[in-house]
Amino acid sequence: MKRHFFGYAAGAALFLLFLFYSADARQGAADGLRLWGTLLVPSLLPYFAAAGVLTRLGAVDALARRLAPAAARLFGVSGAGAAVFLLGLSGGYPLGAASVGTLYENGTITNDEAEHLLLFCDNSGPAFAVGALGVGVFGSAGWGMLLWGIHAISAAAVGILFRRRTRGGEAPIKPPRKTPDFGAALGGAVAAAGQTILQIGAYVIFFSALIASLGALGFPDTLAGELAFRIGAPLSFFRALFTGALELSSGIGAMAGLPLTPGSLALGEFLLSWGGLCVHGQAGAAAEGLKMRKRLRGKLLQGVFSAALAYVAASIIM
């Protein structure tokens, strides 16, 4: 009973929050559904399906053989792990986690390597960093590319910092399966992508409802206002920080109107690298059966490191 007390209390608090602020929760859920249907499904589903086809046809295995020496030296993982790192950086959240889950499920990597890869292989793609953050917030694709570059460098740095003391990862825990034909690979990939995108939608809708309900309760505005008063930073800065800590897209949207300063660029970089609890939940659903503890530690470190790099780089450039 005592062991589960926090979970019981949190569940009861959420139930009461949604009960007393049901109208706000309903509107937030509707906004989350709209975000999922109009932005996330069109932008993520094709990438998930394409990555699934490549994995099922053995393209990742072929790339892994070429990347194996560098992957072992830099990260202490197999070549498949390095291939997932590149997939995650190109496709965005949570493609890296989904790819790790697929490789673990088909026996290409072990449980230990899979959980280690979640430290640094699930990242934002350039489309979101440039489009939503660079152009959408700062009005510049150039700033977006710089922030995504720092994001990629910081992810690699976390992977190197927590390098596994192995020689290129372990052997597969299952014998390699026969490569399916293209039709079977496409069908399986699309079905898996559909399941993953539905899970992502559930998390986005839930966290959108949560943010709306907390807003009606007065959080995060009360805490953001107190910090803004004490530190002297804009209220919108801390509102974006607290919102983005929960859900990335909402946090980036809350940054609209912030002046272009090293501090605001560092904030955007932190949110991009941390990803938000919503993205962490999506990663857990996409990589079912794997523990997320290492991932949370790695993403928090990546967020702090990338924010510091962004602040220094912006201070030099501006």
Can you annotate each of these PLM segments?
Residues 74-138, 240-259, 265-289:
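Alpha-helical membrane segments and immediately flanking helix-loop junctions
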Residues 9-22, 29-49, 53, 148-230:
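Selected transmembrane alpha-helices and immediately adjacent juxtamembrane segments
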